[in-house]
Amino acid sequence: MPTSPGLTEEQRSDLMRRLATSAYKRGNFTLASGRQSEHYVNCKPVSLSGTGLLLISTAMLSHVEDQSVAVAGLTLGADPLVSGVAVAGSLAHRDLDALIVRKAAKGHGTGAWLEGPLPQPGALITVLEDVVTTGGSSLKAVNQLREAGYVVNRVITIVDREEGGAAAMDAAELELISLFRLSEISAFAAELNQ
């Protein structure tokens, strides 16, 4: 099992265990994409816990492009991720801002799609995601950022469900980096339940 840069093998195993026990469920589920699945992954119980967010943020930070000035993601799943990675960056003496992409423009005031300290147009931003299935949520965030004049080349996700998201990212000229694949987490969960 390869080690995610930024995490020791022990830390990676700890994060995998947390995801397998607190984020992963097996049953019959309807996903955000509308697809039916026997696997469900909700990373919020892990990303909203102190140690879980620290592990995720450390791993994600190691994949953020060196020239990136900010991390961004679609609310709600990416909210703790962008904050956690920005803080991890600061602790590592790396200045990164956090941006939240709304699902719809703000209905009052400025009508903003983006929240946070906005960098200059043309700046490189890395998109963070909790779970990628078809890539729709990530692409919505990427499209809003690109329309605002930012450059986005990479999406980092905690879990790739391996259901077409990587191909969708590739078609949008994006590199998808996943900390874990669903097949890894489901196999680990099965081992724990034996």
Curated annotation (Swiss-Prot):
5-phospho-alpha-D-ribose 1-diphosphate binds at residues 102-103, 106, 108, 129-137. Orotate binds at residues 133, 161. Its cofactor is Mg(2+). Keywords: Glycosyltransferase, Magnesium, Pyrimidine biosynthesis, Transferase. GO terms for molecular function: magnesium ion binding; orotate phosphoribosyltransferase activity. Its EC number is 2.4.2.10. InterPro entries: OPRT, Or_phspho_trans_dom, PRibTrfase_dom, PRTase-like. Disulfide bonds: none annotated. GO terms for biological process: 'de novo' UMP biosynthetic process; pyrimidine nucleobase biosynthetic process. Pathway: Pyrimidine metabolism; UMP biosynthesis via de novo pathway; UMP from orotate: step 1/2. It catalyses: orotidine 5'-phosphate + diphosphate = orotate + 5-phospho-alpha-D-ribose 1-diphosphate. Homodimer. Belongs to the purine/pyrimidine phosphoribosyltransferase family. PyrE subfamily. PANTHER family: OROTATE PHOSPHORIBOSYLTRANSFERASE, URIDINE 5'-MONOPHOSPHATE SYNTHASE. HAMAP family: PyrE. Catalyzes the transfer of a ribosyl phosphate group from 5-phosphoribose 1-diphosphate to orotate, leading to the formation of orotidine monophosphate (OMP). This is Orotate phosphoribosyltransferase. It comes from Synechococcus sp. (strain CC9902). The gene is pyrE.
